[in-house]
Amino acid sequence: MGIMCSGDVSERMNKTIELLKEQFLSIHSGRVNSGQFEKVMVDCEGASVPLVSLASIRVLNANTIVVTPYDSALLSQIDRALRNVPNIGTPGNDGECIKIVMPQLTEARRHEYVKQARVKAEEARVSARNIRRKARASLDAMGLAKDEIVRREKELDKLTKDVISVVDDLLRHKESELLRL
């Protein structure tokens, strides 16, 4: 049956939305978010280990996050990894935990982040359209009756429109979050 299993197409469209949500979490909006640190990898004895498996990450207030290692011997490696994360404040190591005070965003920086969000949203839209295009191509290759092809293409178009609508809603929400002072 190929790519045209409606569940497969729907699943791929949902993955596009989930990826966009993850990407939006990594765009700093003026408030700290523990999601910004989920992808941070720590060099630990020659292996890259996710920060979330080595330390607790706690939001202290709107601008401060506290990273407390489960093993205090890993404090310096975690500190080093956090210093390599772009767009966060300088980590402050007090010997037990690491506090990161996120800098306030300037108006220019907020607009730069809005542009990044728009680029990510457009990439998600393009991805949804590419999934639709591939599904249509597999429909044509299936040799179905013309009316069945038309019916499935309408379903594809509706699914694609719905996904793009969700992408647009996520973008609007992220833009308002970024531009709110």
Curated annotation (Swiss-Prot):
Gene3D superfamilies listed in its UniProt record: 3.30.1360.40, Ribosome-recycling factor
A single GO molecular function term of this UniProt record: ribosomal large subunit binding
Subcellular location: Cytoplasm
Cellular component, GO annotation: cytoplasm
Example GO biological process: translational termination
Keyword annotations: Cytoplasm, Protein biosynthesis
UniProt function note: Responsible for the release of ribosomes from messenger RNA at the termination of protein biosynthesis. May increase the efficiency of translation by recycling ribosomes from one round of translation to another.
Recorded family membership: Belongs to the RRF family.
Name of this protein: Ribosome-recycling factor
Gene name for this UniProt entry: frr
